[in-house]
Swiss-Prot record:
Other comments on record: Present with 736 molecules/cell in log phase SD medium.
Sorted UniProt keywords: Cytoplasm, Endocytosis, Isopeptide bond, Ubl conjugation
Domain of life: Eukaryota
Organism listed in the record: Saccharomyces cerevisiae (strain ATCC 204508 / S288c)
Gene from which this protein is expressed: ART10
Role description: May regulate endocytosis by recruiting RSP5 ubiquitin ligase activity to specific plasma membrane proteins in response to extracellular stimuli.
InterPro entries tied to this protein: Arrestin-like_C (IPR014752)
UniProt-annotated location(s): Cytoplasm
Protein name per Swiss-Prot or TrEMBL: Arrestin-related trafficking adapter 10
Length: 518
């Protein structure tokens, strides 16, 4: 009967996933029903990332009337690899002085413990990167990425094209025990027989090592465009998107016959395509192009995120837009409050209007419904070809008039004008809504397509998020919708660490002294 070997990993410090400060440790169990010749038993801790990208035949370029054949592009990066021998012990192994003579192990059960050092901060593959290596990160900002798509085999069992293409990028960490038998070598069996057992685990670095740093060169940032050949937007299985951004340096574009290209798969409703010709970057012409990047500005130390478009008002001359103002909306941790006062997320939302104040004060403007979506953009890169995947999670959808608060959410009696009187603003008090003020982000630690919610960027995989705030309005009986996009937003699956100030010691009056009579 063949030997049975298994791995038992000690649980992580937080009880959920391994992190940067953990030391991987555990026990290797070996059961033998008969004597066996064993040369050595090793435990290997390793991680790797793998991506596969495709080129759509529809967008292939022709050379002299000949269509270039399509091909798959694969990349494989070794993130880390450490090996530890658990049998035989070091003193015995050193005494062998290179001898390959095996050990005869009697039947029975054997346990071998192992422990590795803390996880490295940077991936091992950096030493193999050259000046021509195509990657999303540089040597200075590269960090060991979190586990991603470790259940990729399950995606192939689902008849869903989006999940199939989503599984083309993965980051997997594992502990592998390798038992090398001591069978004598011969000309027809030149290698020792190996028995392997693998145990995968989830690794997520500390938040400081997940932060996506902005690109060093703003010229490398390319706006994403909507390909309307299949419609402006598409909703499938409650997953949709409105905006995305693909950032790839121009030098990283695959060049074929003097023309370079980066292409997303056609199976997604939005395609990102860029051409490089004569050293210049230009967008691929499409039937209708809409920019999705919103400009932000600072007001009183807060970033202002305006709505993507202005809404015309019934008088034909006035218009209004929505502004979200925040100091810290670019990072959101799990269990952060989204609308509560002081959360610095959506607690300061304003309606900004332009027009005649007398006309504006007569209008009936009421917020009716609110929907907040989390938009995911995952980009895989391989051999200079990048494919984008897009999906959406609905965080909340609520009828704002279902529960009445003490004060109206929008009171036009509190409208005020700016310093030059050209615009007027009024606060939309979403923070006072009895449901919204209790809403926290990702309280249940949701797994989207098998992965926790976190942003990260590594050599060939980039996962970013943005927030989309949709509000439906009733304006003099006419329904209109506003949209605000916050892009990008750094998402963490960890709970924010609240540093509480140490309480001052209680005041104790000093003792009183009396002079003793001499």
């Amino acid at each position: 009967m063949a030997p049975k070997i298994s791995i038992s990993l000690n649980p992580p410090y937080n009880g959920e996933f391994y992190s940067s400060n953990d030391q991987m440790s555990g026990i290797v169990s070996l059961q033998l029903t008969k004597a066996l010749s064993i040369r050595k038993i090793s435990v290997i801790l390793k991680g790797f990332s793998e991506t596969l990208t495709k080129i759509d035949q529809e967008y292939m370029f022709q050379q002299n009337g000949m269509m270039m054949p399509g091909q798959d592009n694969k990349s494989f990066h070794t993130l880390m690899k450490f090996e530890q021998r658990v049998f035989p012990p070091d003193n015995v192994w050193n005494a062998l002085d290179g001898s390959s003579k095996p050990f005869k192990v009697k039947p029975g059960s054997y346990n071998y413990s192992f422990q590795f050092d803390k996880f490295p901060r940077k991936p091992e593959c950096l030493k193999n990167h050259t000046a021509k290596t195509v990657a999303f990160v540089t040597r200075s900002n590269a960090r060991l990425p979190p586990t991603f798509n470790s259940h990729w085999q399950e995606f192939n069992k689902i008849d869903n094209l989006d999940l199939y293409f989503y599984s083309f990028g993965k980051v997997i960490y594992m502990v592998q025990v390798q038992l090398e038998l001591g069978k004598s070598s011969s000309w027809f069996k030149p290698f020792h027989k190996l028995i392997r057992e693998i145990e995968t685990f989830e690794f997520i670095p500390e938040p400081k090592d997940l932060i996506i740093e902005p690109d060093e060169d703003d010229n490398e940032e390319l706006n994403a465009f909507s390909n309307n050949s299949r419609g402006n937007s598409m909703v499938t299985n409650n997953e949709f998107f409105n905006s995305s951004n693909l950032k790839v340096p121009s030098k990283d574009v695959k060049v074929v016959n003097g023309v370079g290209y980066i292409k997303s798969d056609r199976n997604f409703s939005q395609a990102n395509s860029i051409l490089i010709e004569n050293g210049d970057i230009r967008s691929r012409p499409v039937s209708s192009v809409t920019s999705t990047r919103q400009s932000t500005r600072l007001v009183n130390g807060m970033k202002v995120f305006p709505s993507t478009y202005k809404m015309g008002l019934p008088d034909g001359e006035s218009n209004m837009r929505i502004e979200v103002r925040s100091r810290d909306l670019k990072q959101i941790y799990r269990k952060d409050y989204l609308f509560r006062s002081g959360s610095q997320n959506f607690d300061k939302v304003y309606v900004v209007m332009e027009g005649n104040i007398a006309s504006l004060s007569k209008m009936q403007i009421t917020p009716l419904k609110l929907q907040l979506n989390l938009l995911e953009t995952t980009t895989y890169l391989s051999q200079g070809i990048a494919n984008g995947n897009y999906s959406s999670l609905k965080l909340i959808e609520i009828d704002l008039n279902q529960l009445k608060s003490n004060k109206p959410l929008l009171d036009l009696n509190e409208i005020r004008e700016n310093f030059d009187g050209s615009m007027f603003e009024c606060e939309l008090r979403l923070k006072d809504h009895p449901i919204l003020r209790k809403l926290v982000f990702n309280e249940e630690d949701y797994r989207h397509r098998g992965n926790r919610l976190y942003s990260f960027k590594t050599c060939t995989i980039k996962r970013t998020f943005s927030l989309q705030l949709l509000i439906e309005w009733g304006i003099n009986g006419i329904r209109k919708q506003s949209e605000v996009n916050i892009d990008p937003v750094q998402i963490f699956c960890q709970v924010r660490e609240h540093v509480e100030a140490e309480a001052l010691p209680r005041y104790v009056p000093p003792p009183t002294y009396t002079e003793m009579a001499s």
